[in-house]
C-alpha cells in the first residue's frame, strides 16, 4: 500500500504516505492496492477513448463511466474491495467493446500506450493484489525523485477531484464533450508516467481550468433542476418524529428521497455537505425537510450513533460505521461503499423508509437554533453593487473567503479563531464542510448585509469566483486587486482541484492549511509561492496582520 492523497496521511522523517496494513482513513491495504489497479485500467480505457475520437467514435457510456469509477477511489468514498474489482472488470469490458468498434473502421489500429491492453490476470483478489504491485504509485519514486513524483500526484489527485464533479454534473443531466475529451487526455497522459517538470506544472493548471468548466455545468445542473439558492434559515436542532439523515453532495438523491417520503410522517435531515440544499427553492418547499443534523464529517461516528433513524450516504465522506455500531442502518448509494453495509443500486428508497418507520425517531423537539444558508451565485451577483458601494464608502474594508474541507486535526481550530478575529467592518464568505468550524456562531450584520455568507458546497467555489470576477470588472481591476483574501482548509482531492482551478485563473496570495499536502515537497511549495504567492497558514494574528496591514 502507498497512498498520500489526503491531509491526514502518515508523515514521518523517512517520507509521507500511508503504507501499512491500513490507512489513516480506514482504507485497507487490499482496497488501496486494488484502487491503484483500477486507476491503471481506467488510464488504458482513456487512451482508447482518445483513439476512438480520432475515428469519430464518441462512446457516451464510457464518458460517464470513467470519471464515476475514478471517483470511487477518492478519500472516504468506497472501501469495498469487491466493488472496486467490479469497476475494473467493467472498464475492461467497455475498452474491449470500444476496440472492436474502432477495428471495424480500421482493422490495423493500435493504441500506443503502456496500459492500452492491460488485462486482469485473474478473478480472485489475491491474484489481483499481486498484479496491483506493478501499479503502486511510488514504484519509481526513487528513480524520478520526490519533486516529479509530487507533481504527478498533484495532477492525479486534482483529476480525481474533477472526476467527482463530472459525476455530480452527470447525475443532473449535464455533460460536455470537450470536458470528457480533456479528461481522457489527462488521464491517459498520467498513465505514461510523465517526467517533465514544465509539462506536469502546465497540465496541473490545465486540469484546474478544465474543472472550472466542470463546476460551471454542475452549477447549471443544480440551478436548472432546483432553482437559484435563496437565503434561508435552517434549524440545526432535532424535531420530534421519525427521521432519515442524508449526507454527501447529491441533491438529486435528496429530491427523490423527499418525494418518496411525502405523507409518511418521516422528517428528513441533511448532514455535512448536504446543508446547502435548504437554500434551493425546489427542495426547501418540502415541509418535512426539517433541518440539518450534526457537524463536520469527521464527527459522524459519534453523531450517527445518536441519530434515531437510518442514514443515507450519497457520496463522500463515509468512515467506519462499526465504531458507532450503526452499520445496520447506514445505506450507501452510487459510488459509495463500505463492506457489509446495505447498498442501494436503484432509485427506490423503500428499504430505508421502512427502516425509518420501524424506529423511534426523536422523542421531542429541541429549542430551535437557526443558521442561514443560500448565498449562491445569483444572490452573490445581485449583491455586487451593494458590496461595491460599501467598499467605496469605506464601510466594508475586506472580504474573506474562509472555507474548504474539515478534518480531525487539532490545528484546524485556526479556522474558527480566524473567523472570530475578522474585524466588524469585514465580511466572511464560507463554503464546503469547513464552515462547520464557525457557522453556528453569530457574526451579525454590516449595513444590513450578513457578515457570514454561506455560499454552499465545495463546488460552489464557482459562485465565489464569479462574484470576484464581476466585482473586478465593475471596479476595473484584477481579482488580485480586490479587497479579498482566501483562507482555505483542505482535506481531500476535491479541495486539490479547486485550488488548481483558482491558481489556473491567476488567483494569488491564497493561504492554505492546516498542513501542506504530503505529496508536495519543499521545492514544489517554493514554486507555488514564487508563481502564485500561495503560502501555508501560520498564526491567526500574523496572517491577519499580513492581510490587513495592521
Swiss-Prot record:
GO biological-process terms attached to the record: nitric oxide catabolic process; response to hydrogen peroxide
Binding site for [2Fe-2S] cluster: 3, 6, 18, 25
Gene: hcp
Main location: cytoplasm
Keywords from the UniProt entry: 2Fe-2S, Cytoplasm, Iron, Iron-sulfur, Metal-binding, Oxidoreductase
Modified positions (Cysteine persulfide) in chain numbering: 405
EC number(s) reported in the record: 1.7.99.1
Family: Belongs to the HCP family.
Cofactor(s) recorded in Swiss-Prot or TrEMBL: [2Fe-2S] cluster; hybrid [4Fe-2O-2S] cluster
Reactions accelerated catalytically: A + NH4(+) + H2O = hydroxylamine + AH2 + H(+)
Protein name (record): Hydroxylamine reductase
GO molecular function, one term: hydroxylamine reductase activity
Chain positions recorded as hybrid [4Fe-2O-2S] cluster binding sites: 249, 273, 317, 405, 433, 458, 492, 494
Subcellular localization: Cytoplasm
Residues forming coiled coils: none
Keyword Iron-sulfur among UniProt keywords: yes
Note on cofactor: Binds 1 [2Fe-2S] cluster.
Pfam families named in the record: Prismane
Enzyme class at the top of the EC tree: oxidoreductase
Alphabetized Gene3D superfamilies for the sequence: 1.20.1270.20, 3.40.50.2030
One GO cellular component, as annotated: cytoplasm
Record function comment: Catalyzes the reduction of hydroxylamine to form NH(3) and H(2)O.
Amino acid at each position: 500500500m502507498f497512498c498520500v492523497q489526503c491531509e491526514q496521511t502518515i508523515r514521518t522523517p523517512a517520507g509521507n504516505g500511508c503504507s501499512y496494513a491500513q490507512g489513516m482513513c480506514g482504507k485497507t491495504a487490499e482496497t488501496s492496492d486494488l484502487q491503484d489497479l483500477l486507476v491503471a485500467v481506467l488510464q488504458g480505457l482513456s487512451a482508447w477513448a482518445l483513439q476512438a475520437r480520432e475515428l469519430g467514435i464518441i462512446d457516451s457510456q464510457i464518458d460517464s463511466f470513467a470519471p464515476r469509477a475514478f471517483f470511487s477511489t477518492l478519500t472516504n468514498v468506497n472501501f469495498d474491495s469487491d466493488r472496486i474489482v467490479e469497476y475494473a472488470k467493467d472498464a475492461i469490458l467497455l475498452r474491449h467493446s470500444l476496440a472492436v468498434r474502432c477495428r471495424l473502421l480500421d482493422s490495423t489500429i493500435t493504441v500506443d500506450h503502456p496500459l492500452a491492453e492491460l488485462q486482469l490476470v485473474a478473478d480472485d483478489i489475491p491474484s489481483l493484489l499481486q498484479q496491483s504491485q506493478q501499479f503502486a504509485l511510488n514504484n519509481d519514486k526513487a528513480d524520478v525523485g520526490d519533486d516529479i513524483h509530487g507533481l504527478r500526484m498533484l495532477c492525479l489527485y486534482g483529476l480525481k477531484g474533477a472526476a467527482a464533479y463530472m459525476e455530480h454534473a452527470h447525475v443532473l443531466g449535464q455533460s460536455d464533450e470537450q470536458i470528457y475529451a480533456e479528461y481522457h487526455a489527462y488521464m491517459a497522459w498520467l498513465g505514461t508516467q510523465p517526467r517533465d517538470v514544465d509539462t506536469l506544472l502546465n497540465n496541473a493548471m490545465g486540469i484546474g481550468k478544465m474543472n472550472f468548466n466542470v463546476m460551471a455545468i454542475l452549477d447549471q445542473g443544480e440551478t436548472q433542476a432546483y432553482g437559484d439558492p435563496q437565503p434561508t434559515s435552517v434549524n440545526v436542532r432535532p424535531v420530534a418524529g421519525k427521521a432519515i439523515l442524508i449526507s454527501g453532495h447529491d441533491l438529486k438523491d435528496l429530491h427523490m428521497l423527499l418525494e418518496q417520503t411525502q405523507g409518511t410522517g418521516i422528517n428528513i435531515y441533511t448532514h455535512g455537505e448536504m446543508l446547502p440544499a435548504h437554500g434551493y427553492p425546489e427542495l426547501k418547499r418540502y415541509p418535512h425537510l426539517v433541518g440539518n443534523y450534526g457537524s463536520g464529517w469527521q464527527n459522524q461516528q459519534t453523531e450517527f450513533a445518536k441519530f434515531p433513524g437510518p442514514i443515507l450516504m450519497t457520496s463522500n465522506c463515509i468512515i467506519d460505521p462499526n465504531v458507532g455500531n450503526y452499520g445496520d442502518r447506514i445505506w450507501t448509494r452510487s459510488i459509495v461503499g463500505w463492506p457489509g453495509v446495505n447498498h442501494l443500486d436503484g432509485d427506490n428508497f423503500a428499504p430505508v423508509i421502512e427502516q425509518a418507520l420501524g424506529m423511534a425517531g426523536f422523542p421531542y423537539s429541541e429549542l430551535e437554533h437557526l443558521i442561514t444558508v443560500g448565498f449562491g451565485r445569483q444572490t452573490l451577483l445581485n449583491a455586487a453593487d451593494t458590496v461595491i458601494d460599501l467598499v467605496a464608502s469605506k464601510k466594508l474594508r475586506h472580504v474573506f473567503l474562509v472555507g474548504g474541507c474539515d478534518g480531525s486535526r487539532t490545528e484546524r481550530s485556526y479556522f474558527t479563531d480566524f473567523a472570530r478575529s475578522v474585524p466588524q467592518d469585514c465580511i466572511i464568505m464560507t463554503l464546503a464542510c469547513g464552515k462547520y468550524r464557525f457557522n453556528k456562531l453569530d457574526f451579525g450584520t454590516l449595513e444590513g448585509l450578513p457578515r457570514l455568507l454561506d455560499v454552499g458546497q465545495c463546488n460552489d467555489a464557482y459562485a465565489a469566483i464569479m462574484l470576484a470576477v464581476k466585482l473586478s470588472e465593475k471596479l476595473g481591476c484584477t481579482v488580485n486587486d480586490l479587497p479579498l483574501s482566501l483562507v482555505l482548509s483542505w482535506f481531500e482531492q476535491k479541495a486539490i482541484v479547486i485550488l488548481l482551478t483558482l491558481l489556473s485563473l491567476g488567483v494569488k496570495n491564497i493561504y492554505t492549511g492546516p498542513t501542506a499536502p504530503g505529496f508536495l515537497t519543499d521545492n514544489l511549495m517554493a514554486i507555488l509561492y514564487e508563481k502564485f504567492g500561495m503560502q501555508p497558514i501560520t498564526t491567526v494574528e500574523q496572517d491577519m496582520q499580513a492581510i490587513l496591514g495592521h
